[in-house]
Amino acid sequence: MFLVRDVMYCKPGKVRAMTEKFLAMNKIGERSGMPKMRVMTDLCAERYWTVVAEMEVPDLTAWQQMMSNPPGSEADMKEFEKIMKDYHDLVDTGKREIYKIEG
């Protein structure tokens, strides 16, 4: 089992908007069979205005397949695109972390 974590360092005042995007994506993702995503905001972190979204996947092959060919209908994919439109305006930078869950 692996934990895939996307860390977004938002621009000042943009955390709520980015959080809402991740929460909306999670609803669609769960409906279409993707793993449930945990969405977190910082109280104290490496940088202010941090949003973290993470999910557990059984293996990296499954995650890679999910990223290259997401489950769900064409309408779901269009809704994903609509939700994430202009998200770059909310974010300074970000990173992805992948961890093997040992126990």
What are the residue ranges of the model-derived segments?
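An amphipathic, aromatic/His-enriched active-site/gating alpha helix that lines ligand/cofactor pockets
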Residues: 20-38, 54-98
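Residue-level preference for beta-strand/loop junctions
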Residues: 2, 47-49
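A short beta-turn/loop motif at secondary-structure boundaries
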Residues: 41-47, 87
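Absolute protein N-terminus
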Residues: 1-2, 103
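Short, surface-exposed ligand-recognition loops at beta-strand->loop->(often short) alpha-helix junctions
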Residues: 9-20
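A general secondary-structure junction signal
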Residues: 41-43, 98-102
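Short coil/turn motifs at secondary-structure junctions
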Residues: 11-13, 44, 58-60
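Active-site-flanking beta-strand signature of metal-NTP-handling nucleotidyl enzymes
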Residues: 3-8
